[in-house]
Amino acid sequence: MSPLHFSFYSAFTFSSLGLAFHRTHLISALLCLESMMLSMFIPLSIWPVENQTPSFALVPILMLAFSACEAGTGLAMLVASARTHGSDHLHNLNLLQC
């Protein structure tokens, strides 16, 4: 495994561990999700160049568009929860409470 691939795998692993262990605030969970998306975006954008397959060149752009939609939805949830509950703690966002 090359050092470049190892760095991408470790970035994804560390951001998923951050999502698993630092789940106190919604903004920290959103940052971990965004770092996971970026750690997947960079190898996906390098892969068509290495393999010289231009048909897969649009896949990273599509993933980046979905990532932007996810970030916008997450920030809208952050603002809505801060307005209704007064904080962005994840333990306040229990769906079983009405």
Curated annotation (Swiss-Prot):
<dbReference type="InterPro" id="IPR039428">
    <property type="entry name" value="NUOK/Mnh_C1-like"/>
</dbReference>
<keyword id="KW-0812">Transmembrane</keyword>
<keyword id="KW-0249">Electron transport</keyword>
<keyword id="KW-0472">Membrane</keyword>
<protein>
    <recommendedName>
        <fullName>NADH-ubiquinone oxidoreductase chain 4L</fullName>
        <ecNumber>7.1.1.2</ecNumber>
    </recommendedName>
</protein>
<feature type="transmembrane region" description="Helical">
    <location>
        <begin position="1"/>
        <end position="21"/>
    </location>
</feature>
<keyword id="KW-0679">Respiratory chain</keyword>
<dbReference type="GO" id="GO:0008137">
    <property type="term" value="F:NADH dehydrogenase (ubiquinone) activity"/>
</dbReference>
<feature type="transmembrane region" description="Helical">
    <location>
        <begin position="56"/>
        <end position="76"/>
    </location>
</feature>
<keyword id="KW-0999">Mitochondrion inner membrane</keyword>
<comment type="function">
    <text>Core subunit of the mitochondrial membrane respiratory chain NADH dehydrogenase (Complex I) which catalyzes electron transfer from NADH through the respiratory chain, using ubiquinone as an electron acceptor. Part of the enzyme membrane arm which is embedded in the lipid bilayer and involved in proton translocation.</text>
</comment>
<dbReference type="Pfam" id="PF00420">
    <property type="entry name" value="Oxidored_q2"/>
</dbReference>
<dbReference type="InterPro" id="IPR001133">
    <property type="entry name" value="NADH_UbQ_OxRdtase_chain4L/K"/>
</dbReference>
<feature type="transmembrane region" description="Helical">
    <location>
        <begin position="26"/>
        <end position="46"/>
    </location>
</feature>
<keyword id="KW-0520">NAD</keyword>
<keyword id="KW-0830">Ubiquinone</keyword>
<keyword id="KW-0813">Transport</keyword>
<dbReference type="GO" id="GO:0005743">
    <property type="term" value="C:mitochondrial inner membrane"/>
</dbReference>
<keyword id="KW-0496">Mitochondrion</keyword>
<dbReference type="GO" id="GO:0042773">
    <property type="term" value="P:ATP synthesis coupled electron transport"/>
</dbReference>
<keyword id="KW-1278">Translocase</keyword>
<comment type="similarity">
    <text>Belongs to the complex I subunit 4L family.</text>
</comment>
<dbReference type="GO" id="GO:0045271">
    <property type="term" value="C:respiratory chain complex I"/>
</dbReference>
<comment type="subunit">
    <text>Core subunit of respiratory chain NADH dehydrogenase (Complex I) which is composed of 45 different subunits.</text>
</comment>
<keyword id="KW-1133">Transmembrane helix</keyword>
